[in-house]
Amino acid sequence: MKEIVDAYFKKYGIVNHQLDSMNSFYATPDNPNSVMQQIVDETKVSDDADPGYFVLDPAKTGGHDIRIYYGRVRENGHYVGEQTIFIGKPEIKEASGASNQITPNEARLRDLNYLAPVTLKLRIVEDGIEKGSEIIKVGDLPVMVRSKICTLSEENLDQYIEKNNGPIGLSRREKLQYVGEDPDDPGGYFIIGGSERVIVSLEDLAPNKIMVEWEDRYESKVEVSKVFSQRGGFRALTSMEKGTDGTINVSIPSVAGTVPLVILMKALGLERDVDVHDAIASVPEMEPIIYSNIEDSKNPKVLPPNGVNTTEDAISYLEKRFAAGQAKEFRDKKISQMLDHSLLPHLGDSPSDRIRKAIYLGRMARSLLELSLGIRKEDDKDHLANKRIKLAGDLMDELFRSAFQSVMKDLKYQLEKTYNRKRGIKIRPAVRQDLLTQRVLHAMSTGNWIGGRTGVSQLLDRVSNLSTISHLRRIISPLTRTQPHFEARDLHPTQWGRICPNETPEGQNCGLVKNAALLINVTQGIDPDSVMEILKGMDVREVLEESPKKGRVYLNGDFIGYHDDPRYLVSRIREERRSGRMSDEVNVRYDDNTNEVIVNSDRGRLRRPLLILKDGKTVLDRTMIERLKHGEISFEDLVKQGAIEWLDAEEEEDTYVAVYAYDIPEKCPHCNSYLYRSMVDWVNPGESEITLECGFCHQRFNVPSKLSKENTHLEIDPAMILGVVASIIPYPEHNSSPRITIASAMAKQSLGFAQSNVRIRPDTRGHLLHYPQVPLVRTRVMDYIHYDRRPAGQNFVVAVLSYEGYNIQDALVINKAAIERGLGRSTFFRTYSAEERRYPGGQEDKFEIPTHDIIGARAEEYYKNLDDSGIIFPEAYVEGSDVLIGKTSPPRFLEEGEERLGPQRRRESSVTMRPNESGYVDNVFLTVSESNSRVVKIKVRSERIPELGDKFASRHGQKGVVGLVVPQEDMPFTEDGIIPDLIFNPHSIPSRMTVGHILEMIGGKIASRTGRFIDGTIFSGEPEKSLRDALVKYGFRKSSTEVMYDGITGRRFKADIFVGVIYYQKLHHMVAGKFHARSRGPVQILTRQPTEGRSRQGGLRFGEMERDTLIAHGAAMVIKDRLLDQSDGTVLYVCGNPSCGHIAIYDRRKGTLRCPVCGNTGNIYPIETSYAFKLMRDELISLGVVMRLMLGDMK
């Protein structure tokens, strides 16, 4: 169903889920019920006021009742009234005070934060009389690039170009180019301090959902029931456990210890024993355990004299347990806080919600006992129905909620502090705007989030366009990387079509860092009250009495009532959804085992689209497909018309999905061409008989249908199970799974044409392949990610041949002439920047050529390429330590001596090239920062020509480094005179089982000969037989082998050599960026050993294993040379007094050596030792342990 997939990507972008998430978060006029507005409405500043307003302390306002309203009014469980919070367009407040709208590229160039102002409407009510309202700015929030408030959104971009007198009549792509953007950039990231950062999606357990499992306790297993109760940003774990003696106890957050279930249910208002029994029991086998727990609660030892019988008794028991010895008022407050706020907060926080909580606890106990009795299995934590995905908007929700509450609390404090009866309330000066802004920016720039999570915000990977898209679609698990977590890392059946089965890192992150599949959608959530109203209209009744025949109905994990015919209810909900009368965000499932109807409408569910089947036929028909092709209807219309529906993992348990509607015959019955799915068109979807049309001869023929009446849905395209990166691999179904995982990792490291605005991007580092090519063997998914416009590789002519041992162990032999013609050449860019900072006291940095009187000034030749302003000329050649930006700064500290009275000498603080790099100055950017100080960015380029040690990889995980560069005249050649660009070792194929590599070589050979692209899409690519027939047709052997001759001797090879054309990727692991050696250089201050690392001109570590090899050889002097002379060898003077043995010191006044302990001055000897030994001795002395050195004559 290529047309449907085309329509999907025409409607939705590749990172649409992230954009939708932030669009629903931002408070814009067209989104009055935004997440931001909901947070404002739910924010509670103090206990004496409801959410949405706060009351100033009457003691500080002269007894006046002054209320500040910032949220909407709540009526009948709904918020009504006008929107109170708004977010504007991205802007920057210049040092002059003017506010200007900015573009993402300006933010990158000037190291700015890409922020939009947030304004809040506040109403002041004094003694019941409204004094008016005021709209004030409360801070700034980061703007997601390409979201609806971004400057690049269609409406905003038109206004920006018009305001700046830009050209008219431009297309969308031309407008984006005009403002310095790549038209194919997907967006979905933020710009903080000029750096692009992405909020990576987080996988978490579903809130408000009961989970039952077995847990190990002291060599025995106990049944545990848990629920992560979440409401308004507050999350609390309530757990229930059945002991070995049958007692059921509940753990409540915020209090230590456990509470017996029956006592807690009675404290919540379920006073009668029969009500407690009915709330728990579902089968007669449970009754003995329930009765036992009820009887235990009535034991006089629990609460003298008669045990717990009433709600008052239960409250008394809780007071005795958790607030013993406190005043009555404090006890009441403590228990109310525990029952109303800490226990199951998602069910409400008022005393009227206690009965609901008691019934919910009964349901938890029922699930626990069902597990104990074997009626139900333990819940699978790795099932996607029990997971929720937190997108950028959800994570920003947590951050904004915390920051906004801080702002409101601070506003209350400031108003109480500055209140003056005569002047009245002055809100604007009391608001500290930086509080919200800095709180959010700190989290965004460091990745440290609310709740102690780290790494939530990451620097966007810009190595290639593919790596960028992959990073934006990544999903990470919060589980610790050091633990095995085997089940969590494994593929789960519910991940089919939702999570890519191949794209995951190797190592400790394997299976915990995942990527979304191609056709996915993450629900934004809808108001459960609206769903509840519809369900009530379908005869869902909220009654306490339960009949075994009635089905229990749950909405978002919360029990809402019963229905007489649960199967009918489920079919009715689906009918309403498919007809468009109910939101397509709603998913429903009937659990046959427990007779439960589970309805979900919450946010964070990962869903995928499927074609709906009725009576073994698709609802989709030919008319819909034709209208889709001509753009008359969209993918969304197919959902509204009931042809396609989005299913979450919960509802998919109720379905029977067909993978294919039909099997394709090997050959066309009319033209005898080999057929494959890309070259066959399904003419009559929606009919029982299936008619196909051949893509070669356009003749039609019938095939039997594979669909049965039991099938409920049909896959749109099985190729959509893969993620973005794995989808560009041709013929992946012919490779072993680990190779696809490796290939996915390699593709993200490949160099190519990452962004079209590369010349004006000030990235810290970047790569550009000189001649990127479109792969000859391609997949359909490349069209959706615009891979042809942003390729990352080249087509190589490859011979599979051992060559003198130089391509052993995955090494590659490469043709020198091909390199000279430009094969594999790339440019590496590095940007250096400097700013004229201003310091307290009026001092500032200055761009200039430092003169000889400047402290630390270099020799004149280092400044030879600078102009008069201290900035280097474009296209100047620079090498390691050359100055790029001449800069002087005021002294760091006050200087001592006579010079303190004279003028201060400035110090040299120029920006220089990295020591091991060289290149040409590609670009010089001059701009100003937010504080109006000058900023200079120098972009240096260096050419990277393939050399020994550079890494290349095919799209099948066959990676290798260049082992030999051979002149063309010495390379083997075919009888047609074809000289390969690359010689690949045949031993790399058998054990790795990368048959796709061989098929791509054959396909590339045919594509080169015929001028047509070969389709290698997973499950639907051109078959091997078709490729081999094409080889014969164009004069090659069926096996693709050729006669080859040795370029050195001219003799024919005894074996025929497999030759083909395959797409190779140059990876960013290059020798020029890694090679390093030193003879002398800096040492560490503490240990006096050479520094570590290339960037610090460090030495190469001579480790323990290397030392052991020299010991084995008996090379004592070599050991001394490596570990002492060339490391931290030092001379110590030691007191020779037999009773002393301390290290001597040098007496400057007398010019002699003496022992500081015994005073000896004559008997002192030099010894050669490692400085690390002296350091260890000094540290032992600091512990009060002295090490005496005993000297002896060398023998």
Curated annotation (Swiss-Prot):
One of its GO terms (molecular function) is zinc ion binding. It is found in: Cytoplasm. Keywords: Cytoplasm, DNA-binding, DNA-directed RNA polymerase, Metal-binding, Nucleotidyltransferase, Transcription, Transferase, Zinc. One of its GO terms (biological process) is DNA-templated transcription. It holds the Pfam family RNA_pol_Rpb2_5. Its EC number is 2.7.7.6. Residues 894-914 are annotated as: Disordered. Part of the RNA polymerase complex. DNA-dependent RNA polymerase (RNAP) catalyzes the transcription of DNA into RNA using the four ribonucleoside triphosphates as substrates. This subunit is involved in DNA promoter recognition. Belongs to the RNA polymerase beta chain family. This is DNA-directed RNA polymerase subunit Rpo2. It comes from Thermoplasma acidophilum (strain ATCC 25905 / DSM 1728 / JCM 9062 / NBRC 15155 / AMRC-C165). The lineage of its organism: Archaea, Methanobacteriati, Thermoplasmatota, Thermoplasmata, Thermoplasmatales. The gene is rpo2.
